Regions:
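Basic- and hydrophobic-enriched, low-structure N-terminal and domain-boundary segments
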Residues: 1-22, 26-27, 31-42
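P-loop NTPase motor domains
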Residues: 30-197
Length: 197
């Protein structure tokens, strides 16, 4: 039996693609139902995080689909109504500093890719250092976008601290949009959720 919720397989996403009206949503509903039905009584029940881009799964008219997935409307997360009840940042409590260093590079690249603006190597490196410093301040607990921007600003030359650059612009957008909670309030591994987009 394949443990899709374990950490042995690092990338267990499923992609369903097709043209408009080809039945992608229905196929996805059938697949999720089959996967959940076959695994729910096993030692490795398959849970999911579904990003509902078209609003079909979160539409009250399609509540029957929720029953197929063995969830109810409380599993629908709407970031427009309230922040997603989890943090996008890892908890590195008790972990090696090098893990944070590697993560900071990955996270800096991810943040930089949000906006198409030109970002210099210096800005990217400064962001990575800011993430490391934010983790030091939080004692390796999950950081926040506010904490990262404060550390980023502190690393800027004095003359540039009051100015926005591409990195600060992206971070300010993330802060203003308030998409995520500052701590995990749900378990994304043990439960299934639909994120209304």
């Amino acid at each position: 039996l394949l443990n899709l919720n374990g950490r042995d397989i690092s990338n267990t996403q499923i992609l369903v693609a097709g043209t408009t009206g080809s039945g992608k949503s229905n196929l996805l509903a059938v697949l999720l139902n089959e996967i959940r039905t076959l695994s729910i009584e096993s030692p490795y029940p398959v849970n999911f995080l579904l990003f509902d881009y078209k609003g079909e799964f979160s539409d009250p008219a399609n509540n029957a689909w929720l029953n197929l997935f063995e969830i109810d409307r409380s599993a629908i997360l709407d970031p427009i109504v309230s922040p997603l009840p989890f943090t996008p940042f890892k908890d590195f409590t008790g972990r090696a500093q090098n893990e944070i260093n590697l993560y900071s590079t990955e996270l800096a690249l991810a943040i930089c890719s949000i906006d198409r603006a030109t970002i210099s190597a210096n800005m990217s490196n400064r962001l990575s250092e800011a993430i490391i410093n934010a983790y030091k301040k939080s004692q390796n607990h999950p950081v926040t976008f506010d904490g990262i921007i404060k550390e980023y600003t502190a690393l800027q030359p004095d003359k540039d601290r009051d100015k926005d650059d591409s990195i600060k612009s992206v971070l300010k957008q993330l802060i203003r949009n308030n998409l995520f909670a500052t701590e995990d309030r749900i378990d994304l591994i043990k439960d299934s959720y639909i994120v209304k987009m």
